[in-house]
């Protein structure tokens, strides 16, 4: 009995001392120089030739290095060399006074090395051939790059090159792309290569700052082509090899993904402090699907930075007397900082224009629905006012966006304010579309439309979907919501197996062409594998786009953009949705950074004070011990009578035995 009590007390003692931070979700000590964050769903690919989603590029931009990057500090955004010695030299080839080709001469820096990798037996130096090899991969039928459709219009010989590779793969399971020359991408010497494009395309330089044009060593391609690798799903999709400041140390998307410093990284200097970068040793991203647990871990100090969900907004943000967002007292007491930026992005609901009901020439149905979906209400209910209702594809901050150029199909001027048209206007359009009061003449019942969404398990999603059902119900339309896992959802959009769906776009580069191309027919998702997810086609819009894309940023270009916007607003392939305003919170141990809405390779500029973090985590996560002390007292009260009884019994027995 005495021994049992001793064991109970020991267990109680160790539970209150050794496990002082028993809610710490991390495997290693938080006093290490490691940045902690979260992700809610696994990226689909980390192949730089394929990755296009923001959750993918935020990872691979730390690993792969295209030739150019954005200056971290300058605004407006400006391109500068990354692996190049200088900005590309541009030469124009003319014929009869017309530019028929543009040639970019790119010279890379020597002594840039790849990360350690089993495909590279020695410390492998970056060479020009690696960049050319990657450009060739963009045309490979085994890669299916989403930018093939765009690049085939520009890179000389690109379309024919894809056909050549298609034929070659009919006879071989793997081919060395070095054996197949591409007219539009040629190696000049070890550190120099040329890219040749048709005509003039000023935005091409922006593409050279994207992961698509990062280098890929032939050895890595060969390594992953081995049958044993494919059988075990060991591919470049999941095991990147780059020259960047970080490498992927652990890739378990069902638990966590870990980026660690690349030991072969050449080293750069911070543009402000002049300290060596990168400064953070590791980035640990933990899978955390639910917004509330993510938020709680941030408040406990276990995540270093955080966004703000709708559930947490009121506890984090309040408005000052001028209506500007500021931190609540509780956030200020923790030393948390707030950063706000208007995101150069658009989130919209798309109509699959290949669908026989919502697509094609059924624009009055699309217009009716577009009027009905009250995005002003959506922004207040679910975004806490953190957004601007979209009138077209171009977001604020990008040339071509004009606050006073409203979408006249959906809005009208009410004094100095744009106001959404009344539901009566939408019902009239719906009747003209052949669905009076939302009745489908084929069935005599309410028109049923399918809305495909990704399944995240987020409680916010249920409320938003219920709200969306009510919006369609205003027209008498029944909305059938089809939940799909994220990767499967992307596949359904890619094959056109959707009717209505949510989609979004974050700017690749700060030019209106990067948003207007989302509605260019040659970028159709189903036919061309491009980023026109709605598969919208209109020859007039295409003609205007081809004019706008190469024009200088001036008044003439703005006039053409206005004409283009009026056309696509009339056709309504999108319910234009919202341009978000990003709110980011950082703990006091995270050094201030300058938000960059375009660049993704900014992890290297971040710095933390891990000792301060550990101290505050201990302060904020002290266990509440009084229930345990009450339990201890209760145990003592129970055990004392038992001990006394036990002692008396043992003592009595001893006396009896003695007198015998």
Model-found features: residue ranges?
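Structural transition elements
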Residues: 246, 388-435, 455-463
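Extracellular/periplasmic solute-recognition and catalytic clefts
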Residues: 249-260, 286-354, 376, 380-382, ...
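Periplasmic-binding protein-like
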Residues: 359-403, 418-427, 568-576
